[in-house]
């Protein structure tokens, strides 16, 4: 069974936003945890949209991870609407164009996000910036 991952970010006109998303995509791809890893954007004018990314994938099951800090409209309404899933919070499983799709929870409450916040501060001393 081929497994895929779509990382969904908000989207921005700034190139750096896409570059950061690509960095995470590449790291996950190199881990070998999934057969395919793609990025997509929830903002309507950014491509690819999540449905487009899913259509391009040759996988039996695709996990969609919202790279968002909490449940906002993109996670509770826009993403489910786009894939024909019920609105609201929580993990959602269903089928989209013949593929099993699982919309995961946004990452904001994960303990690793807490550690990333702390690391952002601790990194200052290691990089030789900030504290003197």
Curated annotation (Swiss-Prot):
Q: What's a Pfam family in this record? A: CbiX
**Domain of life the protein comes from:** Archaea
What are the alphabetically sorted keywords of the record? Cobalamin biosynthesis, Cobalt, Lyase, Metal-binding
Which reaction(s) does the protein catalyse, per the Swiss-Prot or TrEMBL entry? Co-sirohydrochlorin + 2 H(+) = sirohydrochlorin + Co(2+)
Q: What SUPFAM superfamilies does UniProt report for this protein, alphabetically?
A: Chelatase
Enumerate the residues binding substrate: 46, 69-74
| Binding locations of Co(2+) | 10, 74
The entry's active site is 10
GO terms (BP aspect) = anaerobic cobalamin biosynthetic process
**What InterPro entries does this protein's entry cite?**
CbiX-like, SiroHydchlorin_Cochelatase
The UniProt record lists the EC number as 4.99.1.3
Pathway involvement of the protein, from the record:
Cofactor biosynthesis; adenosylcobalamin biosynthesis; cob(II)yrinate a,c-diamide from sirohydrochlorin (anaerobic route): step 1/10
Recorded GO molecular functions are: cobalt ion binding; sirohydrochlorin cobaltochelatase activity; tetrapyrrole binding
**Subunit description:** Homotetramer; dimer of dimers.
> What job does the chain carry out?
Catalyzes the insertion of Co(2+) into sirohydrochlorin as part of the anaerobic pathway to cobalamin biosynthesis.
Q: Which family does it belong to?
A: Belongs to the CbiX family. CbiXS subfamily.
**What HAMAP family does its record include?**
CbiX (MF_00785)
Tell me what this protein is called.
Sirohydrochlorin cobaltochelatase
């Amino acid at each position: 069974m081929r497994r895929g991952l779509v990382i969904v970010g908000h989207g921005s006109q700034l190139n750096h936003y896409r570059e950061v998303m690509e960095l995470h995509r590449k790291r996950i791809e190199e881990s070998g945890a999934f057969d395919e890893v793609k990025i997509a954007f929830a903002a309507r004018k950014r491509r690819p949209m999540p449905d487009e990314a899913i259509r391009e994938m040759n996988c039996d099951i695709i996990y969609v991870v919202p790279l968002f800090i909490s449940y906002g409209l993109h996670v509770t309404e826009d993403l489910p609407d786009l894939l024909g899933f019920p609105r609201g919070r929580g993990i959602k499983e269903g089928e989209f164009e013949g593929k099993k799709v699982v919309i995961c929870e946004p990452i904001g409450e994960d303990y690793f996000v807490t550690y990333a916040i702390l690391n952002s501060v601790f990194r200052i001393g290691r990089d030789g910036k900030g504290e003197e």
